[in-house]
Amino acid sequence: PLATKLAVNDHSCVNAATQWAGIAALEGPQDAVDEMVRAFDARRKLIVGKLNALPGVSCVTPLGAFYAFPNITGTGKTAGELQDLMLNEAGVATVAGTSFGALGEGYVRFSYAASAAQIEEAMSRIANIL
């Protein structure tokens, strides 16, 4: 199918312009990277602190990406139940851990690729429903 052909070419035949852009990004100024690292570190600390303050929730500090994956078993809800509750009652989108396999039960994934203000608002909304 067409999608397969596109994927094969996209994954194995990266065009020259994209390759040159990648080189420029790697060899160019890195000050933006340092700024992003600091911003994501602050957001990570914020969300982990807020998650650990929620009743029945326990979150270790993630070491990569921009996702927190707290244990929610203390809430008495399944991952799917809590995902739905947060979306429907608090307007906060998360991903049930079971979306990543059966061993994800008891966990919900949060993204902290958002502003600190958005994270604060989301955590406040969740605190109001738990």
Task: Give the residues covered by each predicted segment.
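PLP-dependent class I/II
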Residues: 1-130
